[in-house]
From Swiss-Prot:
Assembly: Part of the 30S ribosomal subunit. Contacts protein S5. The interaction surface between S4 and S5 is involved in control of translational fidelity.
SMART domains: Ribosomal_S4, S4
GO (cellular component) term, any one: small ribosomal subunit
HAMAP family per UniProt: Ribosomal_uS4_B
Protein's recorded name: Small ribosomal subunit protein uS4
GO biological process assignments: ribosomal small subunit biogenesis; translation
NCBIfam families tied to this protein: PRK05327.1, rpsD_bact
One MF annotation (Gene Ontology) recorded for this entry: rRNA binding
Xref: InterPro entries: Ribosomal_uS4, Ribosomal_uS4_bac-type, Ribosomal_uS4_CS, Ribosomal_uS4_N, S4_RNA-bd, S4_RNA-bd_sf
Residues of the S4 RNA-binding domain: 93-156
Domain of life: Bacteria
Keywords, comma-separated and alphabetical: Ribonucleoprotein, Ribosomal protein, RNA-binding, rRNA-binding
Described purpose of this protein according to its UniProt entry: One of the primary rRNA binding proteins, it binds directly to 16S rRNA where it nucleates assembly of the body of the 30S subunit. With S5 and S12 plays an important role in translational accuracy.
Length: 203
């Protein structure tokens, strides 16, 4: 299954989760798209609930199914901690996500584009791989030639707050993941136990 590139507003309403991070797409129509959206009250099966939660998390980070599943498999090999939380930490440590958390992009999709286009440096070296795994303390910055890219400057200006687990210097356009986040600091709307149950049946 390839990465979803369709209308994010419709997908957000279908999942009941803001994929843009703004919440605007749910403000007026907090129901699934389609003719019968407002009256759709069908109950999901256990599998349906697990699948829906998996899709919410996958689309939230903008990953294709294969890449998402492979990351879950990597999480199963971490011996300490719980599987669900370890999986979410691996998602959080992706370079495109850290760029988004720092406020250098307004969405994860935009952050992925910035990384792909070579705008982002890690410890002074250009990294154009969105899945690059960031270590706490590494410096994430904007390449000098890209420091006047309007979309980056607009994203920084539009960012009102940042998570407690990152630091950011708006003048230098650089920051870092200062520590790994706690569970209550990321995606409180996600029940990762359902995602684990889904993949435990599939793998």
């Amino acid at each position: 299954m390839s990465r979803y590139t369709g209308p994010s507003w419709k997908q957000s309403r279908r999942l009941g989760l803001s994929l843009t991070g703004t919440g605007k797409e749910l403000a007026r129509r907090n129901y699934v798209p389609g003719q019968h959206g407002p009256n759709n009250r069908s109950k999901l099966s256990e599998y349906g609930l697990q699948l829906a939660e998996k899709q919410k998390l996958r689309f939230s980070y903008g990953l294709g199914e294969k890449q998402f599943r492979n990351l879950f498999v990597q999480a199963t090999k971490i011996k300490e901690g719980t599987l669900g939380f370890n999986f979410m930490i691996l998602l959080e440590r992706r370079l495109d996500n850290v760029v988004y958390r720092l406020g250098l992009a307004t969405t994860r999709r935009q952050a992925r584009q910035f990384v792909n286009h070579g705008h982002i440096l890690v410890d002074g070296k250009r990294v154009d791989i969105p899945s690059y795994r960031v270590e706490p303390g590494q410096v994430i910055s904007v390449r000098e030639k890209s420091m006047k890219v309007p979309a980056i400057l607009e994203a920084v200006e539009a960012t009102l707050g940042r998570p407690a687990f990152v630091s950011f210097d708006a003048e230098k356009l650089e920051g870092s993941l200062t520590r790994l986040p706690e569970r209550d600091e990321i995606n409180p709307e996600i029940n990762e136990a359902l995602v684990v149950e889904f993949y435990n049946k599939m793998l």
